[in-house]
């Protein structure tokens, strides 16, 4: 019975975009996005420029590029639906725009998880903008 309850809880969709992305990050990395990724490297957080500093920063660069390709809605505001299944994220819903946003966030959260071994809080947290002057890679 307990297993069925856990499965039911894990399949509940979440609403509210920023909360959704934060929850994805926590589920995949066991770290809060706000404190672990908001001011990391040259791309994690609002904006972004220069060359990504490490694999985690590259996750944010790719996420920014992904948002740039979303059409017909605001990627930072539109709420979408998803579930956590078998340790992964599955985007749902019928709205193509919301699904694109979800896929961008899913890919970033999974990328953060896959690069935890190179995450360097001491070196890249609140990284100086003056160190992000190299030419950016193209999306």
UniProtKB/Swiss-Prot annotation:
It is found in: Secreted. Its EC number is 3.1.1.4. The keyword RNA-binding does not apply. Residues 1-16 form the signal peptide. The keyword Transcription does not apply. Snake venom phospholipase A2 (PLA2) that inhibits ADP-induced platelet aggregation. PLA2 catalyzes the calcium-dependent hydrolysis of the 2-acyl groups in 3-sn-phosphoglycerides. Expressed by the venom gland. Disulfide bonds join 42-132, 44-60, 59-111, 65-139, 66-104, 73-97, 91-102. Binds 1 Ca(2+) ion per subunit. The active site is at residues 63, 105. This is Acidic phospholipase A2 H1E6. Ca(2+) binds at residues 43, 45, 47, 64. GO terms for cellular component: extracellular region. InterPro entries: PLipase_A2, PLipase_A2_Asp_AS, PLipase_A2_dom, PLipase_A2_dom_sf, PLipase_A2_His_AS. It catalyses: a 1,2-diacyl-sn-glycero-3-phosphocholine + H2O = a 1-acyl-sn-glycero-3-phosphocholine + a fatty acid + H(+). Keywords: Calcium, Disulfide bond, Hemostasis impairing toxin, Hydrolase, Lipid degradation, Lipid metabolism, Metal-binding, Platelet aggregation inhibiting toxin, Secreted, Signal, Toxin. GO terms for molecular function: calcium ion binding; calcium-dependent phospholipase A2 activity; phospholipid binding; toxin activity. Homodimer. It comes from Calloselasma rhodostoma (Malayan pit viper). GO terms for biological process: arachidonate secretion; lipid catabolic process; negative regulation of T cell proliferation; phospholipid metabolic process. Its cofactor is Ca(2+). Belongs to the phospholipase A2 family. Group II subfamily. D49 sub-subfamily.
